[in-house]
């Protein structure tokens, strides 16, 4: 972890034109879309996600069969099948001038 935290990202941001002041990204890992109403499931069990004014990626397919590997391949830039952990979704947002927070349970 110490080695990873010392690695610098390689992002080059050419333009940032944010439409909104605040962006919220919710990652519903370990959940099947057919069990959630907002994603086409049969139950009305996601009232907030079903009504929120946002972009929902309902057709995403996990990059791997395990959560850890799937998120590593999804949230990081991948070169030759290997995640570049320093070049990830959060470092890209930071490089673009956004403040970021990570909440996890």
Question: Which ranges hold each PLM region?
Answer:
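Active-site-proximal alpha/beta segments of enzymes that process anionic O-linked groups
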Residues: 1-25, 30-105
């Amino acid at each position: 972890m110490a080695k990873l935290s010392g690695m610098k990202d390689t992002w080059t941001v050419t333009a940032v034109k944010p439409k909104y002041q605040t962006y919220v990204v919710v990652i519903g890992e370990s959940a099947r879309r057919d069990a959630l109403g907002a994603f086409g499931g049969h139950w009305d069990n996601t009232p907030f996600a079903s009504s929120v004014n946002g972009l929902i990626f309902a057709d995403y397919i996990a990059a791997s069969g395990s959560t850890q590997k799937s998120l590593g391949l999804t949230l990081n830039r991948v070169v030759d099948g290997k995640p570049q952990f320093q070049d990830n979704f959060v470092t890209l947002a930071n490089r673009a001038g956004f403040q970021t927070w990570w909440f996890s349970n």
